[in-house]
């Protein structure tokens, strides 16, 4: 896409806002490289990539990327034999630390979601290398500014010797400094350092009283810094130890640099991935500031931007407009008052296209749709080269000529005040001719104009639609609302009347323009009202359709999870059953062995075929395929509404609510209502009522089969549970559902422990996915 277009649309300002949201130079470099793509797959991938991170950013607290920095120059230097210092090694360490923290965050999120919700990020995380050993080595040997003493045994030994020798020197010099006879001879009673040697400040006139080496003097010459002979050898020893320390330090740094060199490829991958993560998070942060949404990209040409607004304008005052090229429309002509928002509309459309094709979420409501353009061309007034001594018309025309030379069917062209700056009749004719030409090219076009001739242009050409910006005659100011499909109308009479012009003059003027034009203006006014109403209805309809689709997708997903969960439970039960049968078979083999021994040794009258038959009866119990009860009954039970039945495929009891034809029935199992085949139902006998004493209860209310404890405090929940179970027993319920939610699991644990001890509870289990999953406990009452 031409840089000239990006400059006109102020895309660099958008990039600067995104750059402000980055943490590292790596992220800022990615922002600077950001440019609109034109390949469909690339654009869609970039948008999905940004949308994934935005979803995560809006739901979770992301780990900090602070300290992330570019390390590729350091890795290169390490690879060619250079030695990295401690600060540079710490930059390497921080990169590894940042990537490990982010990967840990992602793995925790993956564990919570129990599935891969973000495939693009998942792929990036899989590409992150394992650099634990390198991190450990650097972390154990380098602190923020230097090597740790324990970086090696040799270094620790050398530094220990330096410390002990320094202590002896200090003690020696302290004795000299604190000697009463030396107080007047010293400039200050301190020990200081000159040229890496411990010295004392001696007044120049007392030089002869101190045997030693002069290393420095004050600017005035009145103080000499002397190293007494008593510490010269110890200072020499420290110098030698410092040299040894430097050698050992260099050896350790060389060793660590070698580890960096060995992991050079992995470090470059980590740098690339984490730089991209920083870049994507910056996109997500910026998207939040503009309430950006993800558009859907279409192979066919389309533009639908519900309630779009210009992201560089003040969000509190900017007016959002729906911009749409409906059906086969290829050209939209906008008319309306000057400063009414026509140019802003052009720039909004162009900038949103550029943002979307750069992988940025766009400032519209959900549900936007876009096709992908190879180029966006602009001829917008405030960009013209007036300084080149060209007239306004010449400047426009020079730019238009360049556009017409390059545009094709994959282009979007934005014309501002097409044909302006010359004779109105010639300008209007040129404008229509130019529009005819670009229509033949197949480009999509949006143009603004103040020529009334162009209002009629759309009525005798296919694929052309009028639009206008609204003007409020009550306030005598533009509303900046865009009305798609409605041409601009003259407001001269209304404005004149508002300003107090005589009605006689206005009525006389109306007779001069004829009834046809008056009727057209009235028709346009009616269209304005209808357009605004239809626009809002379209947005609301899109929202409802989108919500319905989301609900459908969520239910489909939950149903699939339920099926998977049911399958896993069945397989688990199958495995347990098989293990029990195996155990029983093994035990039977042992019994058979003992029986044979009895027969052989004691002459027991036991026949072999009887033993084999008994063993086969046990073998027949072994279930090799599935535990699910696919029971094929030779004769189906006669089922009626109100019958109590056992659902064979699930092993659960229920009540028939109604029959659906001759083959299906609606069955209530607890809180779940399902349509099931009659062949899957087995009629059960209703339990006989035990004779009980009649207890009269006043104002008794019918209680539900479930108790919702969400929001209760722990003690309150258990008290409520006790009362509910008593009422459920009195109501002869066989099974009830306790809803405690998932949360931290504390309430679930408390409820289940309480049920274990409760006298009225036979047993309990966790809820199936279709019953509420882990957020529900199902209790069977005695």
Curated annotation (Swiss-Prot):
GO biological process: mismatch repair; negative regulation of DNA recombination; rescue of stalled ribosome
Matches recorded under InterPro entries: DNA_mismatch_repair_MutS_C, DNA_mismatch_repair_MutS_core, DNA_mismatch_repair_MutS_sf, MSSS, MutS, MutS2, P-loop_NTPase, Smr_dom
Smr domain ranges (all copies): 707-782
Name of the gene this protein is made from: mutS2
Protein name in UniProt: Endonuclease MutS2
Subunit text: Homodimer. Binds to stalled ribosomes, contacting rRNA.
The keyword Nucleotide-binding appears for this protein: yes
Entry-linked Pfam families: MSSS, MutS_V, Smr
Residues binding ATP: 336-343
Enzyme Commission no: 3.1.-.-, 3.6.4.-
Role of this protein: Endonuclease that is involved in the suppression of homologous recombination and thus may have a key role in the control of bacterial genetic diversity. Acts as a ribosome collision sensor, splitting the ribosome into its 2 subunits. Detects stalled/collided 70S ribosomes which it binds and splits by an ATP-hydrolysis driven conformational change. Acts upstream of the ribosome quality control system (RQC), a ribosome-associated complex that mediates the extraction of incompletely synthesized nascent chains from stalled ribosomes and their subsequent degradation. Probably generates substrates for RQC.
Originating species: Staphylococcus epidermidis (strain ATCC 12228 / FDA PCI 1200)
MF terms (GO), sorted A to Z: ATP binding; ATP hydrolysis activity; ATP-dependent DNA damage sensor activity; endonuclease activity; mismatched DNA binding; ribosomal large subunit binding; rRNA binding
Family indicated by similarity: Belongs to the DNA mismatch repair MutS family. MutS2 subfamily.
Keywords attached to this entry: ATP-binding, DNA-binding, Endonuclease, Hydrolase, Nuclease, Nucleotide-binding, RNA-binding, rRNA-binding
Keyword Hydrolase (UniProt): yes
